[in-house]
From Swiss-Prot:
Active-site feature positions: 93, 179, 181
Residues where ATP binds: 233-239
Residue intervals of the GMPS ATP-PPase domain: 206-399
Single annotated GO MF: GMP synthase activity
Subunit structure, as described in the record: Homodimer.
Keyword Transit peptide tagged: no
Name by which UniProt lists this protein: GMP synthase [glutamine-hydrolyzing]
Activity versus pH, per record: Optimum pH is 7.5.
Class of this enzyme: ligase
Species for this entry: Mycobacterium tuberculosis (strain ATCC 25618 / H37Rv)
Length: 525
């Protein structure tokens, strides 16, 4: 399979900024911030060999933070040869300390730790030029660099870090003890941009137009003269993936919308109307609700449900191929897999499998298509930007994320037709009230979850009730890698709760999930 790494355009996956991951919780965030500076980046594990890194022909390296001390047994080591590749290098936190140690600087246990917001004093240099001399940054370290390597200028300090930043501009090397990638460092994005554009001399080539053009060429190369099928879920990911592929191969793409009976109210009609109107694509709708419900009967385990839905989804495609292609063959299956999907499904060295994604780990072993995943290196905001570049309407590109398995993973317990009707009704009320309150642009998504295996005692009218709770999970995020619960106004929550408990049978309690990600994922299952 031809991967995005084979595209040869400036600062696209052919020549990335590589974020070397030393175990940081923010490695993916660093990659995203680099992309915000319009330079492509990708994360690789610190265990990658020099040969592997050299083969990627990186235009720059960013050494991430990590939880270890450089003196701890088994701590990740920085191969000094990495600094001799002739490419610009920026070290962050642990990466900064490992870089200092490898170049002959001194890293010591100073006895002063800095965790959280810290005052940084800028002492000069180019990395922080034109920025405030005293500024807040986010620190998370116990060890500190006490002496910079020979030939490096100390350009910042803090109470617990005598050398909080250093640079050797002529060698295109720099490092910072703090975390420029987090929002708690107000000038962090400017520092990253200065390294990328001034130290590394990189242009701002990672733009929606360039991304779209590169991905279209990638698809043409991979599919050639073949035919493809794309599964539409109604969401932005599959819609943008389909639009890209159609732009590449035209009417050799057949879009299939599988109505698995796990959709929200009105979604089938919306897909058939909005997507076809925007693209003119060939669309076939498969009514498979009964098949999915039969397969899910008696299954309550989240992973079991995900894998069943993924398996049935592919089977529905195989049936569509036989029925609608009139003897032709379709060798390729287009999916809207994103970078966070791949990461959460254990798609990189050293990553743990959090849950099987419908687009990734839920596919059957006997898959009969070659996968085409043009978006698998993109974050959600980049997908939306590409969609707008392709001319898709806001009704599609601004739609809140909705999981491929649909309401099947928003019912905690067995999925039945009655439970789906209950959840679908509650979900429609929530969406209606959030839209009426003008909150759609403030909320990344708001899963509505039915606790079908839980009964809650209540009083309605003069009688005792024994109904199910509904959970509201409004979250704010930029890319789904991390998320915070959204502070929905109380009066909006009150309207939602009142309407659900009055209008939805079997529900007598509405609760609010106020957990961030991490530790919780956005979806309950």
């Amino acid at each position: 399979m031809v991967q995005p790494a084979d595209i040869d355009v400036p600062e696209t996956p052919a020549r990335p900024v590589l974020v070397v991951d030393f175990g940081a919780q923010y490695a993916q965030l660093i990659a995203r911030r680099v992309r915000e500076a319009r330079v492509f980046s990708e994360v690789i594990p610190h265990t990658a060999s020099i040969e592997e890194i050299r083969a990627r022909q990186p235009v720059a390296l960013v050494l991430s933070g990590g939880p270890a001390s450089v003196y701890a047994d088994g701590a990740p080591k920085l191969d000094p040869a990495l600094l001799d590749l002739g490419v610009p290098v920026l070290g962050i936190c642990y990466g900064f300390q490992a870089m200092a140690q490898a170049l002959g600087g001194i890293v010591a246990h100073t006895g002063t730790r800095e965790y959280g917001r810290t005052e940084l004093k800028v002492l000069g240099g180019k990395l922080h030029s034109d920025l405030p001399e005293v500024q807040p940054v986010w620190m998370s370290h116990g060890d500190a660099v006490t002496a910079a390597p020979d030939g490096f200028d100390v350009v910042a300090s803090s109470a617990g870090a005598p050398v909080a930043a250093f640079e050797a501009f002529d060698r295109r090397l720099a490092g910072v003890q703090y975390h420029p990638e987090v929002m708690h460092t107000p000038h962090g994005q400017q520092v990253l941009s200065r390294f990328l554009h001034d130290f590394a001399g990189l242009g701002a080539q990672w733009t929606p137009a360039n991304i779209a053009n590169a991905l279209i060429e990638q698809v043409r190369t991979q599919i050639g003269d073949g035919h493809a099928i794309c599964g539409l879920s109604g969401g932005v990911d599959s819609a943008v993936a389909a639009a890209l592929v159609q732009r590449a191969i035209g009417d050799r793409l057949t879009c299939v919308f599988v109505d698995h009976g796990l959709l929200r109210a009105g979604e089938r009609a919306q897909v058939q109307r909005d997507f076809v109107a925007a693209t003119g694509a060939n669309l076939v709708t498969v009514d498979a609700a009964e098949t999915f419900l039969e397969a899910l009967s008696g299954v309550s385990a989240p992973e079991g449900k995900r894998k069943i839905i993924g398996r049935q989804f592919i089977r529905a495609f195989e049936g569509a191929v036989r029925d609608v292609l009139d003897g032709k063959t379709a060798e390729f299956l287009v999916q809207g897999t994103l970078y966070p999907d791949v990461v959460e499904s254990g798609g990189g060295s050293g990553t743990a499998n959090i849950k099987s994604h419908h687009n990734v780990g839920g596919l059957p072993d006997d898959l009969k298509f070659t996968l085409v995943e043009p978006l698998r290196l993109l974050f959600k905001d980049e997908v939306r930007a590409v969609g707008r570049e392709l001319g898709l309407p806001e009704e599609i590109v601004a739609r809140q994320p909705f999981p491929g398995p649909g309401l099947g993973i928003r019912i905690v317990g067995e999925v039945t037709a009655k439970r789906l009707d209950t959840l679908r009704h509650a979900d429609s009320i929530v969406r209606e009230e959030l839209t009426a309150a003008g909150l759609d642009n403030q909320i990344w998504q708001c899963p509505v979850v039915l606790l079908a295996d839980v009964r809650s005692v209540g009083v309605q009218g003069d009688g005792r009730t024994y109904g199910h709770p509904i959970v509201l999970r409004p979250v704010s995020s930029e890319d789904a890698m991390t998320a915070d619960w959204t502070r929905v106004p109380y009066e909006v929550l009150e309207r939602i709760s009142t309407r659900i408990t009055n209008e939805v049978a079997e529900v007598n309690r509405v609760v609010l999930d106020i957990t961030s990600k991490p530790p919780a994922t956005i979806e309950w299952e």
